[in-house]
C-alpha cells in the first residue's frame, strides 16, 4: 500500500482560520479536536468535542454537542512580545497516514530578531482519550527570554452558551494538573488531565484564575538553542456515576501518568501503527487524473474514521462529525444513507453499531409517533444521545417582521423512517448477520413499517401518503411524494419479508402489511419515463435557474423569492426522484433513470451538499461519465474548494462520505440489489485505474479495474454479478470487461432482461 497523502494549508490567512480548523481537525471517533492555532486570533473558533456529550444550556435552548475546555492554546512570549499574526515563513500540513498535524513558522519580532517555532500534535488512534502536543522554539540570531503559558482553559463556550460548571482544579507534583467539570444539568462529568514536560533549564509555576488552570514555563535561550515542551492530555467523561468523583478522577490521572512515561515520538509511533493497519484495509487508490482526486479520497476516508464513534453504540455520526458546532452536533438521515455504506463495505461491525444507535432510541421514536397520533416508530429528524426530537421548533427570526417560521422538517420530513429501514436491509444483505436481523433489525423494521401503515390515509378505494416533505426541502407539505411513497412501500415489504422469514407471530401486523402493500397508491411513471415528484409538481411553472445554480450551496434563490413562492415552482434544493433512483436501482429501468436525471437536474439548484454526488452516481449508472466525473469533482470541492468559509462550523460529513460513494458506487458500480452484490464498473476517462477493498458476506475482496479489465482477489469464494452476469471468484480472477456487455447503461439489468 502506498502512503496516504497530506493536506497542506498554502499560506496563513485570518480569513481561512476556521475553514482549515475544520479541514485539518483530528480525532478518533471518541473525541474531535479542531485544528486551531496555539496562539489566539479574534476570529478563531476553538473546539474539542466528545462523541455523545450533549447538553441543553437553558430553557428554550436545544441540546448541543458540548465544546470542551481548550487544551491546545498556548501564549508564547519572546522577550516580552507575544507571538501572533505575521510570519516570515509558513508551513502547515495534516498527515493523513498518521493523523499528525505539523506546523513550522519563522517569526520575527518587532526588533527584527528571528525565531523558528515548530509545533505538532495528534489525537491517539490506539488510546482514545489521549492527545499529545509538542512545540519547539529556537532563536535564530540572538539570545531570548521565552515564556510559554498553557493548560486547561474552561472559558470556552458554544457561541456564548456555557454548558460546564467547574467542579475542581488541582495541581499534582511538578508536572500534572487536572480540571473536573460537570454539565449544568448534573448528568455528565468530564475530567481533563494534563502533563507538561520541558527540556533544559526552566522555571515553572501554576495559576488558577477565571476558569483557566495554567502552567507557566520560562527559559533563557542562546541563539541556536532549542526549547521543547511536550504536553499530554487525557480526557475522560461519564454519565453513569458508578464511582465517586475523586476516585474516578484519580483513575484518569493514573492513565495520563502511564502515558507520560513515554515520549511524544513513542506515543506517535503506536498511534501511527494503528492508522497503518486501518488504512491497509480501507484505502482507495486511483491512477490518472489530477493529484486532487487521490487527495480527496484520502481526505474523505480520514474524516470518515475520525467522525465515527465506533467505540459507542449509544452515539452516532453528527452532520459535522466532531469538527465543529454546525447543526449543534445533531444526527440526521445523512448517517444511514451517506455514511453507513462506507462502514458497511469496510467494517460491518461499525455499521452494526450505528444501526444499534437507532435501536437503542426506539422508545423515543415510538413516543414521538404516539404523540402525533400514529403507531410504530417516528424517528426524530434531528437527534442527539437520548433519541428525542432535537429539531428547533422555529427557524431564525425575520428581523423585519419579528416573526419566526416553524421548521417543517420535524413535522413532515418523515422519509427518514424508511431510510433507516433501508439501511437495516442493506446491512442484512451485505453481512447475512442473522443475530442482528432477528432481534434489533426485526424491531426496527416492524416498528418503522407500523408507522407507515398508520401514516397512510384512505382516499376512496386506495391508500395515499399526504403532507410530507421529500429530500427536496424546497417543496414542502405535498401529497404522494414519490421518494417517500416508494421508500415506505419498500420499508413495509421488507419488514413483511423478514417477519415471514424469521417466524414473526404477529398475524395482525402481517395482515395489515399485506393490505397496505395492496392498497397503497404509487406515483406512476409517465410515458416519457419521468416519475412525477409528487401530485402537484408537474403543474408548477419552471424558471431559469442558471444564476442560482452558479451559486450552488448558498441558497441565493431565497434572496429573490420567499419559501412559499419557491414551493410553488419547479425548483429542487437537491435530488429527490433522482435520489430514489439511487436508493432503489432495481425498481427502475435505465431509460427511466436517464429520463428522470435529464428532467430533474436542470430544475435542481444543488443547494444541499448531499445533491451533486447522488446525481453523479446516477449519471455514472446511465453511462454519462463526463457528467458524472464533473459532479464528483464538484462534490469534493464542497469543503476542499476555494471558498474561504466553506466549512467554518465543521466539515460536511455526508458530502465527505459521498466522495467514497461516488468512486465506489458510481465509477466502480458497486450496489446491493435483491441480496446480490453487483459491480457495473465504468471509469471516467481521467482515471486509468481504480483499486479498492470491499467486504461482502464475510469475504474480504480487493478490486482493481481499468477500462478493459477487472481483477478481483478474495479471501474466500464469492459469487457476484459483473455487469449483470453471475460469476464466482475464488482466490484471484481477472475478467475482460468486453466479455460482459452491460445492457443499456447498466441499471436494473434483471428487469431489462425480463422486458
From Swiss-Prot:
Catalytic reaction equation(s): kojibiose + phosphate = beta-D-glucose 1-phosphate + D-glucose
Annotated EC: 2.4.1.230
InterPro entries: 6-hairpin_glycosidase_sf, 6hp_glycosidase-like_sf, Gal_mutarotase_sf_dom, Glyco_hydro_65_C, Glyco_hydro_65_M, Glyco_hydro_65_N, Glyco_hydro_65_N_sf, Malt_Pase/Glycosyl_Hdrlase
Residues that hold substrate according to the record: 333-334, 573-574
Keyword terms: Carbohydrate metabolism, Glycosyltransferase, Transferase
Protein role: In vitro catalyzes the phosphorolysis of D-kojibiose into beta-D-glucose 1-phosphate and D-glucose. No other disaccharides tested substitute for D-kojibiose. In the reverse direction disaccharides can be formed from beta-D-glucose 1-phosphate plus D-glucose, L-sorbose, D-sorbitol, L-iditol or 1,5-anhydro-D-glucitol, but with low efficiency. The beta-D-glucose 1-phosphate product is the substrate for YcjU (AC P77366), the next apparent enzyme in the putative biochemical pathway encoded in this locus (yjcM to ycjW).
Note: Kojibiose does not support bacterial growth of K12 / BW25113 nor of BL-21(DE3), perhaps because it is not transported into E.coli.
Protein name, per record: Kojibiose phosphorylase
Gene giving rise to this polypeptide: ycjT
